[in-house]
Structures are given as structure tokens and as C-alpha cells.
């Protein structure tokens, strides 16, 4: 059934869902390359009649060049501690998630949903198997950012990132993407699967700034080969 579009006002959206209990590396890999996004054990992608504004993009990590702005962001975070681990859940994670979303409700008019431990587990811990990872960011021992990712055969899928708005000067959102790119380079994985780019949605339009990147050309079924093309 159609529901209000979360990205563009005055539009409806229709999502295609898959629930997979015990998803393995190969299945998650295939779904990500066909435009599905994973949250816990649920996989989804838009399938809206007459609208193709949600465009899946993947950044070419092995050919990405860090410009002056990127290097400046890296320097600002010289004292930021980074820990790569399996996805975790505790009071600090849930509190930071809520703080970030309340901030985005005020800044971008995001709809705020109350979230407890159970809901956080269902969205970000369940189903991570061997491919789900967490990149956690700390300042003076305090958790200030969480970047949840999936490791794929040819890249890294960006699942979700949230951070402490009190540390906005560190640009943790951008910094986390740069760290994904560096990790992909270390692992010799070419792509960062960034999810949906929507040119008229401020929360998603930024993704086109990270070049070079490719676009998933069109809706692709599970039994079809995905076609990605380099963006001009």
C-alpha cells in the first residue's frame, strides 16, 4: 500500500520488502547490489509507480581523491578515536541515537519516533551476521558517532550513521564517509554503496558530491543482473 514519501513532500511511496532470518553473506551481497537497504533482518527498496527520484549510488573508493575540504575534516579529527567492532547496543548508543534524531527533527523536520532498546536491536543489531560492522567514534572517551556498515564482496554498504550534534565542528557525518573510503581502500574493495540519492531532498542530495560514483540504472528484480553506470 502507498504511504507518504519520507523524502519528497506531496508524494506517495511504495516500498518492496523482504524479511530474511539468517541472511548469509552471499544473499546480503546480492541484495545490496540490486538496490536493497538492510535494517536488521528487513530489506527494502522503493518501487514507486511513475517515480524514479530515489537513485542508488555507489562511490568509487579506489579512485576517490581527497580534496582540501576532506583533508581539513581529517585534520580536525586527529584526536578522534575510532573503534571497528560488531554492532553494539548500550545506554550510550540509544541515548546518542535519540539525541541525533531530536536534533534532526528541529533542523530538517524529520519525523521523530521514540526508540527503546528492543527497537534499536531490531533495526541495527539483529541480522548483522558476519558482514555487519560498527565504526564508533569517541572524543575524550565519549561516544560521539556511530556508523553502521555491511562488508560486501566488492565494497562497503553504508547502513546508517548518527552523531552528537554538540560536536558539529568535527563534521562526523562527512568524516565517517571518509573513513569508509579509507577502510575500503585498505581492504581493496572498490565501492561504497551509499544508498539513495534524491536531488530535491536536503538529507540525501549531498551524496552526489562524492565523486566518482555510479548510479543503478533502473529497478532490477532479484533474478536480473544489476546495471550500474558512471555518473557524468
Model-derived segments and spans:
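A conserved beta-strand-loop-helix scaffold within acyl/acetyltransferase catalytic domains
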Residues: 42-50, 59-169, 209
Amino acid at each position: 500500500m502507498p504511504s507518504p514519501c519520507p523524502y519528497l513532500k506531496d508524494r506517495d511511496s511504495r516500498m518492496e520488502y523482504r524479511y530474511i532470518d539468517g541472511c548469509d553473506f552471499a544473499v546480503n551481497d546480492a541484495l545490496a547490489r540490486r538496490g536493497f537497504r538492510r535494517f536488521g533482518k528487513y530489506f527494502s527498496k522503493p518501487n514507486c509507480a511513475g517515480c524514479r527520484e530515489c537513485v542508488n549510488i555507489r562511490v568509487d573508493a579506489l579512485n576517490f581523491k581527497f580534496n582540501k575540504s576532506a583533508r581539513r575534516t581529517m585534520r580536525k579529527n586527529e584526536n578522534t578515536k575510532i573503534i571497528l567492532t560488531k554492532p553494539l547496543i548500550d545506554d550510550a548508543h540509544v541515548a546518542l541515537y535519540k539525541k541525533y534524531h531530536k536534533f534532526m527533527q528541529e533542523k530538517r523536520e524529520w519525523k521523530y519516533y521514540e526508540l527503546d532498546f528492543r527497537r534499536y536491536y531490531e533495526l541495527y543489531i539483529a541480522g548483522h551476521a558476519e558482514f555487519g560492522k560498527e565504526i564508533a567514534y569517541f572524543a575524550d572517551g565519549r561516544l560521539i558517532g556511530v556508523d553502521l556498515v555491511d562488508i560486501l564482496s566488492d565494497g562497503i554498504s553504508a547502513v546508517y550513521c548518527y552523531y552528537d550534534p554538540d560536536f558539529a565542528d568535527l563534521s562526523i557525518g562527512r568524516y565517517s564517509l571518509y573513513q569508509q573510503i579509507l577502510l575500503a581502500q585498505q581492504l581493496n574493495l572498490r565501492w561504497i554503496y551509499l544508498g539513495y540519492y534524491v536531488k530535491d531532498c536536503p538529507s540525501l542530495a549531498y551524496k552526489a558530491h562524492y565523486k566518482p560514483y555510479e548510479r543503478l540504472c533502473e529497478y532490477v528484480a532479484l533474478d536480473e543482473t544489476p546495471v550500474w553506470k558512471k555518473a557524468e
